[in-house]
Curated annotation (Swiss-Prot):
One Pfam family in the UniProt entry: Leu_Phe_trans
Cited InterPro entries: Acyl_CoA_acyltransferase, Leu/Phe-tRNA_Trfase, Leu/Phe-tRNA_Trfase_C, Leu/Phe-tRNA_Trfase_N
Reactions catalysed according to its record: N-terminal L-lysyl-[protein] + L-leucyl-tRNA(Leu) = N-terminal L-leucyl-L-lysyl-[protein] + tRNA(Leu) + H(+); N-terminal L-arginyl-[protein] + L-leucyl-tRNA(Leu) = N-terminal L-leucyl-L-arginyl-[protein] + tRNA(Leu) + H(+); L-phenylalanyl-tRNA(Phe) + an N-terminal L-alpha-aminoacyl-[protein] = an N-terminal L-phenylalanyl-L-alpha-aminoacyl-[protein] + tRNA(Phe)
GO molecular function: leucyl-tRNA--protein transferase activity
Protein name, UniProt field: Leucyl/phenylalanyl-tRNA--protein transferase
Keyword Cytoplasm: yes
Length: 248
């Protein structure tokens, strides 16, 4: 039995989340509302929302937790060639926070194999856009010839980044944005990107599961660190990161 949260109710302890033997491992609580303040409280406690359209807001704390350390991002030989083209061709741009809401909409509407519908409803977009206006939510966008062709968004607290979703309208466009994010965050002292749930795709990019207790210990320290200011990106950041990756 999970807890139902009224607007001012605190989250239950995360060790009350449903266990691996249940049909919904990691499910902790449900609520009717998704406010910006509730989101900030959740992320600081290692809790994230994920639900289908028409359901109440479902709150999760999975164990283990999928994370990506920026230095562990895997760059294949083929993708390394792609990054070189992006770096050398001025038609390719990496922008941060240029089109946050539009990036969320693209994440919601881009078709994905095996996925029907989206949890990124208009209410979700409004809540995260409010966080963006307050400096907590950010987008990393891949542009080509003036067109946004891929990107991702997530939430930053201190030196902790919580990835939410990504999209691509061109091959590797979301992967380029993720590489740029890793390059930027690595340079800012961010040691861990929260990827929430384990998938084969994330594992192929270098993501790995960690025990929830270890994840929460890291969140408590990293999320209380000074915020990253400013969020600014140019290709030199990605170029230096790519060179270091080649030498590793």
């Amino acid at each position: 039995m999970i807890a139902w949260l009224d607007p001012h109710d605190p989250f239950p302890p995360v060790d009350r989340a449903l266990g691996p033997e249940s049909e919904a491992p990691g499910l902790l609580a449900a609520s009717a509302e998704l406010s910006p303040q509730r989101l900030l409280i959740a992320y600081r406690q290692g809790i994230f929302p994920w639900y289908a359209q028409g359901q109440p807001v479902l709150w999760w704390s999975t164990d283990p937790r999928m994370v990506l350390r920026p230095e562990d991002f895997r760059v294949s030989t083929t993708f390394r060639k792609t990054l070189r083209r992006v770096l050398d061709d001025p038609a390719w741009e990496i922008r941060i926070d240029h089109a946050f809401r539009e990036t969320m909409v693209a994440c919601a509407t881009t078709a994905r194999p095996g996925q029907h519908g989206t949890w990124i409803t208009e209410d979700v977009i409004q809540a995260y856009t409010a966080l963006h206006r307050r400096g907590y939510a950010h987008s990393v966008e891949t542009w080509h010839a003036g067109q946004r062709v891929g990107g991702l968004y997530g939430v930053a607290l201190g030196r902790m980044f919580y990835g939410e979703s990504m999209f691509a309208h061109r091959t590797d466009a979301s992967k380029i944005a993720l590489a740029a994010l890793c390059a930027f965050l690595g340079g800012q002292g961010v040691a861990m990107i929260d990827c929430q749930q384990e998938t084969e795709h994330l594992a192929s990019l270098g993501g790995a599961p960690v025990p929830r207790a270890a994840f929460l210990a890291h969140v408590r320290e990293a999320a209380s660190a000074p915020a990253i200011v400013p969020w600014h990106f140019d290709k030199s950041v990605l170029r230096r990161w790519t060179v270091r990756n080649e030498q590793a």
